[in-house]
Amino acid sequence: MKVGVALSGGVDSAVALYLLLKEGHEVKAFHMKTKEDEFFLKKEIKKKVCCSPSDTADAIRIARSLGVEIEIVDVREVFREKVIEPFKRDLLRGLTPNPCVHCNRYVKFGYFMDYVLSQGFDAFASGHYARVEFSGKYGKKVIKKGVDGKKDQSYFLARIEPWRIEKLLFPNGIYTKEEIRRIAEEAGIHVAKKQESQDVCFIPDGSIENFLKDEGITLSEGKVITEKGEVVGHHRGYPLYTVGQRKGLKIEKFGERLYVREKIPESNVVVVSGLEGVFFSGLIAVDPVWHVDLPEEFRCVCRVRKKAEEAPAIVRVKNSEVEVRFEKKIFAVTPGQIAAFYDEDTLLGGAIIKEGIP
């Protein structure tokens, strides 16, 4: 089979490439450039991020060491249009967006995958910790969780278009991270011990405030109020806060621990409450993407953040809106984040959280 492999320059995609070669596939590596090299060089990078100049150099070295052709693909324009600009707009709307999910849908498993397949490849592969398997229950190929529960990345694939699943290969999904590193070492791949990417690639210093400043947006301080309207402190700019957050709030008076419950951009206000106020019995989500056919009402488990515990729920679908009711209240349902739905280890799809239901 002819397989185009997304090679980031990290150990995961390097091993995916290596495994596909061992299986006898005809492979070519493709590397995405999402930002100009100068962007990374002038930033104070606190943690390892993807798509940097050093990643490009590593990707080229990996491909050469394995005897594979590599092509650098410029996705900067579509990345800004589909990821950076919506991220910025959502922050100013008071949301907490997940740019990695949007990148996967529109760029990596969108524009980039389309480009690779247009070159005559039968499949598109990446180093994601997830699996693609045929489901007898749903009668088609589905995405399943990776066997390494700590590294499972299926959540970030919740909104890719369902037709693409037939064309996907995730060789790493049956391995743990430790096994992947061991395979890399045994194969002599030089990035076997390379640090994992941590922050959003276009915010390499981890600062939302600096990102907005670079985009020409100056934040204004505002009031922190309780649900009853009592002013208890001030914030540095509402886009810097998210539902459930406690640290970073300038609370000047109050007896109990307070958490962000809501942001009101129109009045530049952050609303806080006690812990009970940031637990929700359900949520409303919009713009769902379903990987399988489902009834209007079904039971499943729902994850509202990458590291959130999965919550059993009843889901009701009405056109482009999804109502989710949990068996018991969960912490910090955050507008802008993704609600991913699972049937055991099968990913059913995902939707964008509009609001939490108290």
UniProtKB/Swiss-Prot annotation:
Q: Name one GO molecular function term.
A: tRNA-uridine 2-sulfurtransferase activity
Q: Which GO terms describe its cellular component?
A: cytoplasm
| Record function comment | Catalyzes the 2-thiolation of uridine at the wobble position (U34) of tRNA, leading to the formation of s(2)U34.
The residues listed in the UniProt record as binding ATP, with positions renumbered to this chain, are 6-13, 32, 127
**EC number(s) stated in the UniProt entry for this protein:** 2.8.1.13
Q: Which organism is it from?
A: Thermotoga neapolitana (strain ATCC 49049 / DSM 4359 / NBRC 107923 / NS-E)
PANTHER family documented for this protein: MITOCHONDRIAL TRNA-SPECIFIC 2-THIOURIDYLASE 1 (PTHR11933:SF5), TRNA 5-METHYLAMINOMETHYL-2-THIOURIDYLATE -METHYLTRANSFERASE (PTHR11933)
UniProt catalytic activity: S-sulfanyl-L-cysteinyl-[protein] + uridine(34) in tRNA + AH2 + ATP = 2-thiouridine(34) in tRNA + L-cysteinyl-[protein] + A + AMP + diphosphate + H(+)
**In which family does this protein belong, per the annotation?**
Belongs to the MnmA/TRMU family.
Which residues of this protein are annotated with the site description Interaction with tRNA? 128, 337
Going by the UniProt record, its keywords in alphabetical order are: ATP-binding, Cytoplasm, Disulfide bond, Nucleotide-binding, RNA-binding, Transferase, tRNA processing, tRNA-binding
InterPro entries, sorted: MnmA-like (IPR004506), MnmA-like_C (IPR046885), MnmA-like_central (IPR046884), MnmA-like_central_sf (IPR023382), Rossmann-like_a/b/a_fold (IPR014729)
Q: Which residues form the active site?
A: 103, 201
Q: What is its main location?
A: cytoplasm
| Location(s), subcellular | Cytoplasm
Question: Per the UniProt entry, what is one GO biological process?
Answer: tRNA wobble position uridine thiolation
Gene this chain is encoded by: mnmA
Q: What class of enzyme is it?
A: transferase
Q: Which domain of life is it from?
A: Bacteria
What protein am I looking at? Answer: tRNA-specific 2-thiouridylase MnmA
Q: Give a single Pfam family match.
A: tRNA_Me_trans_M
List the NCBIfam families: PRK00143.1, trmU
Q: Where is this region: Interaction with tRNA?
A: 151-153
Disulfide bonds, paired cysteine numbers: 103-201
